[in-house]
UniProtKB/Swiss-Prot annotation:
Organism of origin: Psittacid herpesvirus 1 (isolate Amazon parrot/-/97-0001/1997) (PsHV-1)
InterPro entries: Herpes_UL14 (IPR005207)
Region of interest: Disordered: 162-196
Record's protein name: Tegument protein UL14
GO cellular component: host cell cytoplasm; host cell nucleus; viral tegument
């Protein structure tokens, strides 16, 4: 693991150096092209040694920049392919590691064993139901409350009920007892009879 980390650091360092070198070469090429354009604007002859030197260097850097751009494109394409391949390999490795913990589910006899155990459980449940039905015939039946217990239970329930504060039914004299209809008002004679 440590060696892998060292290799990764070296690779990243080399990439930084290469990128820095390409940048410097591009700056140099741009400087040579600017010099050529400046001398051209100043009317320097193309056969002048300084012009020829700057033009040659600018051309070399231009060609090198094109090649570097093509290489960079290929490198980017290769790195993308490597990244996809690495992702697929890592995914397959993770899947294999996950399935390794459930190898018994993948064995050829797993389904047969599972079916046999399921049948055995079903048979055991049937046997248990038969045993319960057989034993229930020998269990004593539940005893109900006799009449005296029922009366006692009702009395306790009535004693525990709250006492109402006032009766919901308002009593009044009927016409048969007082001679007055509950819907007709009392006359003077009726009131006198009531007071007596």
């Amino acid at each position: 693991m440590a060696l892998y980390d060292v290799d990764c650091r070296d690779t990243r360092r080399e990439r930084r150096i290469q990128a820095r070198t390409k940048i410097m070469e591009y700056i140099k090429g741009s400087a040579y092209k600017a010099s050529v354009l400046e001398m051209t604007s100043a009317g320097v002859s193309p056969s002048h040694p300084a012009f020829r030197h700057a033009f040659t260097k600018a051309t070399e850097h231009e060609e090198a920049a094109k090649i570097a751009a093509q290489v960079d494109k290929r490198m980017v394409s290769v790195r993308r392919k490597i990244a996809r391949i690495t992702a697929v390999v890592n995914g397959q490795r993770e899947l294999a590691s996950e399935l390794k913990g459930y190898r018994r589910y993948l064995s050829s006899g797993f389904l047969d064993t599972f079916a046999a155990e399921a049948d055995k459980l079903y048979e055991d449940e049937i046997s248990l139901e038969c045993a319960e039905a057989e034993l229930s015939q020998h269990l004593p039946a539940g005893e109900d409350y006799d009449e005296g217990e029922n009366e006692l239970l009702v009395r306790w329930q009535l004693e525990g009920a709250p006492v109402p504060s006032r009766s919901p039914i308002t009593p009044y004299r009927t016409g048969e007892s007082s001679g007055v209809s509950p819907k007709s008002p009392q006359g003077p004679s009726d009131a006198t009879c009531v007071r007596q």
